[in-house]
Curated annotation (Swiss-Prot):
This is K(+)-insensitive pyrophosphate-energized proton pump. The record marks 467 as: Determinant of potassium independence. Mg(2+) 1 binds at residues 189, 193. The record marks 178, 223, 230, 686, 697 as: Important for ion transport. Mg(2+) 2 binds at residues 216, 219, 437. Its cofactor is Mg(2+). It is found in: Cell inner membrane. Proton pump that utilizes the energy of pyrophosphate hydrolysis as the driving force for proton movement across the membrane. Generates a proton motive force. Signal peptide: none annotated. Keywords: Calcium, Cell inner membrane, Cell membrane, Hydrogen ion transport, Ion transport, Magnesium, Membrane, Metal-binding, Translocase, Transmembrane, Transmembrane helix, Transport. The chain crosses the membrane at residues 1-21, 50-72, 83-103, 126-146, 164-184, 239-259, 261-281, 296-316, 334-354, 381-401, 409-429, 468-488, 520-540, 589-609, 616-636, 691-711. Substrate binds at residues 186, 685.
Amino acid sequence: MTILYAVIACGLLSVLYAIWATRSVLASDQGNARMQEISAAIREGAQAYLARQYTTIALVGVVVLLLAWWLLSITAAIGFLIGAVLSGAAGFIGMHVSVRANVRTAQAASNSLAAGLDIAFKSGAITGMLVAGLALLGVSIYYLILTGPMGLQPNDRIVIDSLVALGFGASLISIFARLGGGIFTKGADVGGDLVGKVEAGIPEDDPRNPATIADNVGDNVGDCAGMAADLFETYAVTVVATMVLGAIFFGGTAVLGAAMLYPLAICGACILTSIVGTFFVKLGANGSIMGALYKGLIVTGLLSIVGLAVATSVCFGWGEIGTVAGMVITGKNLFICGLIGLAVTGLIVVITEYYTGTNKRPVNSIAQASVTGHGTNVIQGLAVSLESTALPAIVIVGGIISTYQLAGLYGTAIAVTTMLGLAGMIVALDAFGPVTDNAGGIAEMAGLPKEVRHSTDALDAVGNTTKAVTKGYAIGSAGLGALVLFAAYSNDLKFFAANGDKYPYFQGMGEISFDLSNPYVVAGLIFGGLIPYLFGGIAMTAVGRAAGAIVEEVRKQFREDPGIMAGTSKPNYARAVDLLTKAAIREMIIPSLLPVLAPLVVYFGVLLISGSKASAFAALGASLLGVIVNGLFVAISMTSGGGAWDNAKKSFEDGFTDKDGVKHLKGSEAHKASVTGDTVGDPYKDTAGPAVNPAIKITNIVALLLLAVLAHG
């Protein structure tokens, strides 16, 4: 219990850090009256959208809560509620700060680049520490209540089902927040760009564009609240799945409690290292913003090695722990698995930055292709998006095989848990992005001097890269996390099948095989494989419809009031925000339910056709693998490709020199071609790609809960 109390203390410290950082950010100067007016409009729009989104989610959540109570138990229903409320709170509070930090960053940037970086990063760190702290507190305190006052054994089915339900609560919030926020932000961005930049020829963030405020609102609801919910879910479900595997593999042994506490201890230690790492983010003498951010990330990673060693030593020691599936597990090997998790994180960050960073080969190749036209830009962008999947996949494969050889599936789970231990710092890097983007918009709309805009542009360019890098991390950890969930599903299934006397539904079922000679397994793989593509297609269509509505709205305002373009009258910003809010909420419902219902359709569909429970469970398991494999490639391809398109466009804003030495500036034909590519890449990287993440995990969580419901019944 001492370890558990220490873990809870780490979670509380994370929340205290967020409170301190919030006070520090809000105490900063808000700039002049015009800047505050623009910031207030962004803030009101973001809060109005989020309030409506959470109201919609709450209606769905109440139904799921009652179903969890009826089909499982009151403890499962409470677990679901904890996961949903804390996930929503992390995103809402983080966004509450980011929509106030934007104007303060713009004002600080007018003093110095270092001051602007300090406020923007501190604002991002608030969201990051809330995600890690609240997720850890939710799981650890609920586990403490279940195994303490309620007197349940750590591997009791009630404990396991309640923790899985907590993960499902986080998942439900995540998929709605990711998809709804993505539709809103890219509907505004694409629609505003098509009319503003392409038709009217006005720059980005020009106050004459009626979609400008909606675009800035979208940055917050998509990249701040959406990413927070996504990584909260990955964090929570991975820790829960690792605890479930610990309960299955070490049940009935002396190390059962330690095996379930170990992932919590790792996350607690990594929260401390992330907090320390934030204090190292300072602009150096060379003025490199990315260098300052990486300094904090590297310090966090190095200190996490020490934290991992302490967690291993306290929970297990370094010697033999036990034998799982004929494999001897040692504390030393688990520590090495954790190191591999940290290495995978570092490699994915480096690879994603290579594919999306300015002045790197992939981005330069898209910029060069823009010189010959719109079509060649799109072709090269698609080529980069496909190519960008190879290296991350090889790294993930290496991580899976090496950790499995060292400590079996539990070792793989520990590697993923260690990856997610860094979530506090990684989310801080991501939430830094929308703050700097908004700061640039405020500087432009408020007519601040060019020097200020130069500073905010430098921060925004780095913010674009950090957003892409964190998406790569989120996808890699989601794919590996889903693999851990699949391991929990297959081992849970074995457990129920072997204990048919206790669980009558599974009686006489025998061993379930995922053999590819079984046609139901192949059918399950194909069905699972189609889900990420169908889901991505629906998401892209939704953005297209939302963008179309914004195009019509902006054209209408320009047509009805010529004074807008002349600068003598103001556009109606609120009308565009309201239109997008309604569109995003309407469009997110059906695709969000797709990954929730898919596992149920597979299981009951195959059961109805074959009449065999074993075949139905095999098909369901295969469909989970299909979702994981295809989802991983679809998500990496979309996010890296979209990020590369975006930064290729940014290359022209500073002036791009092609292979013949000709310089192409903003407004040139090559720049216009790059805007077309960015328009395609925007929903790729900010809507469909990131939303595939929670879709991968939620299918696996639903499958785990289905087993629990059938066993309970």
